[in-house]
Amino acid sequence: MVMNRAAAKLLGFWAMIVVASVAYACKGNEQIRNGSATKAGSGDTLSSTTVNEDGVGQIQVGMTLDDAVSQGLLNRNPSMNSECDYAYPAVGSGLPDDLGFMIVKGKIVRVDVDTGAVTTDDGAKIGDSEDRLRTIYGDELQESPHKYNPGWHYMTVMGDSASQGKAIVFETDGKKVTRYRAGQLPQVQWVEGCG
């Protein structure tokens, strides 16, 4: 089938209408699921996921796991270790599955990012070069050798959040960011997570 430009434009227009309708319907379901139109429409949407030292979207460092679960943001692991363990995004929360939230004594203390789909507020992400981090963060970036892998690095951003006891820690393979985490000190620096 050969399609002229006018037909292609018309097809593209209808495709956009369908996508917009689905997106609108999904947002409506989010409002229903959360039980509050203001919560879903507050402008703090989880679909535009960015991370900073304070958390991601509605999930903030210092928030209790109970609050995050009751708001439909995180799942509770029934066999969770009360001292330190991880919780993960609830289905329908709008958060990528590749985020992990460290819970220490019932409170969220850090978010671990293992997906390139999530950036920091400054635009840094997995796959970025060490030079890009240096460009973004400048003098705020502190470099140190990786605990287990020679040639790899931790690149830590304290910046203004240092007075609040929070940081972002990027792990690199000596060239590119392989993962990062953000949250409260000292937990954000724990290399083994809860291990």
Where are these regions (language model features)?
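N-terminal low-complexity, Pro/Thr/Ser-rich intrinsically disordered segments
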Residues: 33-66
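Short, low-complexity, Pro/Ser/Thr/Gly-rich segments in the mature regions of secreted, periplasmic
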Residues: 183-195
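A cross-family detector of function-defining hotspots
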Residues: 33-35, 63-104, 125, 130-176, ...
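C-terminal motif of bacterial Sec signal peptides marking the signal peptidase cleavage site
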Residues: 22-25
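Second-shell loop/turn segments in exported
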Residues: 52-58, 117-124
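Bacterial N-terminal signal peptides that target proteins for export
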Residues: 2-13
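Bacterial signal peptide processing site
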Residues: 27-29
